[in-house]
Amino acid sequence: MVQIVCTLLLFMVIIFPIGNYVYHVSVGKRTFADPVFDKMDNFVFRILKIDTSTMTWKKYAMSLLMVNLCLVFIGYLILRIQSIGFLNPNGISGMEESLSFNTIISFMTNTNLQHYAGESGLSYLSQMLVIIMMMFTSAATGFSACIAMIRGLLGKKMGNFYVDFIRIINRFLLPLSMIIGLFLVWQGVPQNLNSNIELTTIEGKIQEIASGPIAALESIKHLGTNGGGFLGANSATPLENPTIITNIIELFSMMILPVSCIFVFGRMAYDKHEESKANNRVYTLSTKNCNRANKVWIGKEGRTIFVAMSILFVIGLGVCFWSESLGNHAVAQAGITETFGNMEGKEVRFGVAQSALFTTVTTSFTTGTINNMHDTLTPLGGLVPLMHMMLNVVFGGAGVGLMNMLIYAIIAVFICGLMIGRTPEYLGKKIEGKEMKLAALCIIIHPLLILGFSALAVSIPEGVNGITNPSFHGLSQVLYEFASSAANNGSGFEGLLDNSLFWNMSCGIVMFLARYLPIIIQLGIAGSLMNKIDINESTGTLKTNTLTFAIILVIVVYIFAALTFLPAIALGPVAEMLTL
């Protein structure tokens, strides 16, 4: 437990300056690196002949979709023809059609679900031009959509997708990925273009040690909340995650961007509040107050969202760590003492504490990378990552986690408004029927995809044939696969035989719909609120920047999760726990 607390406290120290930097990048304020990055941005704008004028929400959404679809087409072709000799020293053959479809949708949507093993399924050309490239673009897509939604909610113009997309890559993802990659190389992560190394084991058998540009992929894999591994065992293997230092670096990397989005939201909401005061002549922004404004890190609105997400995260982390520390009841009944907790499927160099933390972080921040085998978690320990993916608001992936939580905030405001008999307002905007219909549609998509496709999988032979575990754990595998796909997470209970036509196509469809339908709806809500006149705050206005509202938000999230997922969870992880 001490390891977990120290790790999280250290993260809180570094996130404040990083969050402040991301805020400056997002709103176009000056930073120390502008002399370099301004030239990079302008060069890209000039070469691609990009019109940097502001867009409507419809044009923003259409631009986002078109860029992603173009990248999918290019990536799919490369996966199919990767057998060419260029950057393919290990002689990897072209990828099969349905697996290519699943893979390219997976990485385009920031899911990184892998129905293949990277060391035997992809050439270096595919790893670099498809996988690593998609890891940058998918993270930038989610972040750009989030910033556009925040602008709309606050009554500002939506901005320009191409500008947001290029700025976050040039000014944040690329430079920080390079720094993280160098740290990983320092700790022993390979970075080369050599073929796999053949060696003879002490048993006299031939074994291949994977090689390649692992550090380059590993850095953006976590920073962009992607999660797909260069190797099949992902960050559980020493080639991707050799030491406790790399483990902490990877933990911090996948937490940085989602938390920074909350900082951006809080600061932008604070800026709007101060502008509103100045415009109403109620408040004069003196030099002293300007200095105070510069010292605001996250703002009250951002703090409320952060507290709500943190409560959800800490509850899940506590349950996972407690369950794994107790060990496996079935193993204890066999007379085996588990002094260090449930170590099945875990790396000794990390132990239960770092494994439980990594598991909770990777499914809360929807990264999907693993440093232990989730299929070997205890039933209650495995319920935590499953539940966090079903919630899909516990910080979430780059940008989209905050977008989902803001939808819940709108719903919470609406419910509270009904209870006190007032018109619901959020961030100074009146929430009316149109916004509520869109918000309800947005949150129902996630459970509908998970439960609908899970029901289909256990109803037809093509789905049942992939289930390798009987009874309750088999259902948990199916639920986990589709929850991971719908949450754009990518981790899995790897006992599932998922490289088949049914699983490749069904998961691909779920990933695509779960990624783009909510984003379009969320941008639509932001576009609707953007055009509304601000409402002045009164004594009867529900304050959304308090601890009380944070607790209300947590309760609303849990109630919705219970109403939608509790029956399925009771038949899976809960039933498995009760029968051990």
Model-derived features with residue positions:
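Membrane-proximal intracellular helices of multi-pass ion channels
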Residues: 1-580
